[in-house]
Amino acid sequence: MGASVALTFLLLLATFRAGSGHDEVETRECIYYNANWELEKTNQSGVERLVEGKKDKRLHCYASWRNNSGFIELVKKGCWLDDFNCYDRQECIAKEENPQVFFCCCEGNYCNKKFTHLPEVETFDPKPQPSASVLNILIYSLLPIVGLSMAILLAFWMYRHRKPSYGHVEINEDPGLPPPSPLVGLKPLQLLDIKARGRFGCVWKARLLNEYVAVKIFPVQDKQSWQCEKEIFTTPGMKHENLLEFIAAEKRGSNLEMELWLITAFHDKGSLTDYLKGNLVSWNELCHITETMARGLAYLHEDVPRCKGEGHKPAIAHRDFKSKNVLLRNDLTAILADFGLAVRFEPGKPPGDTHGQVGTRRYMAPEVLEGAINFQRDSFLRIDMYAMGLVLWEIVSRCTAADGPVDEYLLPFEEEIGQHPSLEDLQEVVVHKKIRPVFKDHWLKHPGLAQLCVTIEECWDHDAEARLSAGCVEERISQIRKSVNGTTSDCLVSIVTSVTNVDLPPKESSI
């Protein structure tokens, strides 16, 4: 009797401890497998253990595989964190009809050891056929109504398609997504952490199967910006080594909880602004960043009649060009991003929303600050070139090539009017006083930087028509790099007068 009571007490105590421990931490053990273990330098198989300290988070196991003509090719197995699609599933069952990659998840230790594919089958409930007399009555009764409805729908369709292409996008409109990428809808797509916040939303680093991607999430009230950026990305000819790679556009949720996603390539080094804040650049790095940045903007501005078999690529103005919207690859190649304010110039079509004062205030050209814009294609391209001049100055300010100190990173005009200038501050400095960021004296003693400073001045010229084109800037930087790197460090002439003897590409703009 005493032994029985003691055993009961011990069982109750163990149950209490297990229950209290479950409130604090949950543990999940899953079968682990990685088909790309050699490339990712991980184990090929085994057991994965996941511990979560938050009580409201549930832990799951998952499996993903391909079916190649009946041959099952396992892709990955492992632990998965808090997905409502996995709740209360004891077995790992994929229900999609015929995806490119099958995915299933479940709850319970080692529940992903076995996995199956059971597509959902639609049930069909046959109903008795109506008699011939009833059928005739229905046909003769409904035929006029159907005909009238079709006439009304046709008239409405014709009316809508006579409106300009770039009208305001109402929240209940669904303009349709671009042709789906092979990656759209594939699981697992897992948001990892926020990398940036901007005017129209936030950018997440996410994992899509075996690669990292960037997911830009717009709230539903910014649908117009999402729609604009999606249309720019899906314009023919937008695949270029110096433009951000587009993967997919998706809608998540419904009604007021709807989120609008843009999925693009992820670049771990982040923006040019972030890189310059924490790093100095050498002469060769400066040349590589500036030349590839100019190449990307030149291609964006270019009108290509027939681009790589994709159709006509129109000229596109960025309208928010700044160092924050220039990303860097690992080799410091520049990538242009954030086309939420961009505008296309297609022959015979209105350019859409060409409201003058858009973009980031600090990078606005004098004519934008004055509100005196000529709403033509060339005017918008020249506004981008003014902003490029400021970004070039930012890069030069962090270059170690000159024989002198390198200051801490500053935004354009930060030294003159601080970090948060008003529109009136910029109008006074940029428009009325015609002030531009300062060139340090020791920059002008380096032959390459001195020539680049001349190019910068011709980018931010107060007279918009006198500004260089992006293609001319690319060509100039290429020639400057070759002229400087073609001499030895012992033979570099460090006086400004020597710079004036170098033939630069003509100032004539191709805009």
UniProtKB/Swiss-Prot annotation:
Transmembrane region(s): 137-157
Subcellular location: Membrane
Membrane protein topology class: Single-pass type I membrane protein
Active-site residues annotated for this sequence: 320
Biological process, per Gene Ontology: activin receptor signaling pathway; cellular response to growth factor stimulus; pattern specification process
Glycosylated residues in this chain: 43, 67
UniProt key word Disulfide bond: yes
EC number(s) from the headed UniProt entry: 2.7.11.30
InterPro entries linked to this entry: Activin_recp, Kinase-like_dom_sf, Prot_kinase_dom, Ser/Thr_kinase_AS, Snake_toxin-like_sf, TGFB_receptor
Residue stretches making up the Protein kinase domain: 189-477
Residue intervals annotated with topology Cytoplasmic: 158-511
GO molecular function, one term: activin binding
Function noted in UniProt: Receptor for activin A, activin B and inhibin A. Involved in transmembrane signaling.
Name of the protein in its database record: Activin receptor type-2B
Source organism of the structure: Xenopus laevis (African clawed frog)
Gene name, Swiss-Prot/TrEMBL: acvr2b
